[in-house]
Regions:
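Alpha/beta hydrolase fold serine-hydrolase catalytic domain that processes acyl esters and thioesters
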Residues: 1-24, 29-114, 119-123, 127-142, ...
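Short glycine-enriched nucleophile-adjacent loop
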Residues: 182-191
Length: 260
């Protein structure tokens, strides 16, 4: 069954001008949030964006492929997705900026995100899902009973700060908990930015408590919210959803379907 690497073989030679942005592009860009850009892409929102080719080259100068492959992680493929992206016409000209990666054990807080400047002058804001830290998993559990988590609040702050061009078209997305953050940030961000947002993508991300999905602000953004789920989704079926969703086939089974 074809995957995102096959998609880049198939459509990687087409620019966004030739073939407009689609849901698979969203999933590919969401993977960039799992790459460690520490020392490569600065957190400063007004700093020059870093070309993907350059960021990929610097990453692989600092990291060993065999060591990454040996990790016990569902997200270890992300750097290889980035490497493939840098080789394609479709993604090689994207630029990265505003990378943050924060973990605060005492607050049970794990947050990471990166902005992707697209060749069509659009912006994709990618939020990272749960990492391998205990803190990250604790925050996941907190979502079940807290009306808002520190990570969700940080996502709102990040989105408000990262969108510096008030005329730019914006897409927001993430995988797993990153999808939840993408939706939460889009629902709670400044009205000006909400007007700029074209679509919000939750790639197998959990939903929210009923008070959130029934709120006026959530309902206002509902037409722009899109959830993408594998056939036997587990994470994406947690808590409540009201947005439209699309089910995709997966060659994996059980929780392994959560792997993008």
């Amino acid at each position: 069954m074809a995957n995102i690497m096959d998609y880049m073989d198939w459509r990687g030679d087409l620019s966004f001008e030739a073939d407009e942005f689609n849901e698979v592009d969203n999933l590919i860009l969401a993977q960039l949030a799992y790459v460690d850009f520490e020392g490569i892409v600065t957190a400063e929102e007004n700093a020059p964006a870093v070309p993907l080719k350059e960021a990929s080259g610097q990453f692989w100068e600092k990291n060993d492929k065999d060591e990454i492959l040996a990790r016990v992680s569902m997200t270890k493929s992300a750097p290889f997705v980035m490497e493939k992206m840098a080789e394609t016409k479709r993604f090689s000209d994207v630029k990265l900026r505003c990378y943050v990666n924060e973990i605060r054990d005492e607050e049970q807080f794990q947050f990471s995100a990166v902005c992707v400047e697209l060749p069509d002058d659009g912006l994709y804001v990618a939020f990272r899902g749960t990492d391998n830290t205990i803190t990250g998993w604790r925050e996941d559990f907190n979502m079940g009973y807290l009306s808002e988590t520190p990570g969700q609040l940080r996502a709102v702050e990040y989105l408000n700060r990262a969108v510096t061009d008030k005329k730019q078209r914006v897409r927001v997305g993430g995988h797993s908990k990153g999808g939840n953050f993408a939706v939460y940030a889009s629902v709670k961000c400044d009205p000006q930015i909400q007007n700029q947002i074209l679509n919000v993508y939750s790639n197998d991300g959990p939903g929210f408590r009923s008070d959130m999905v029934e709120s006026t602000e959530y309902q206002r953004m509902l037409p722009k919210l899109h959830t993408i789920l594998p056939e036997s989704s587990i994470v994406g079926m947690l808590l409540e959803h009201q947005e439209s969703f699309e089910v995709v086939k997966s060659s994996n089974s059980g929780i392994q379907q959560h792997d993008a």
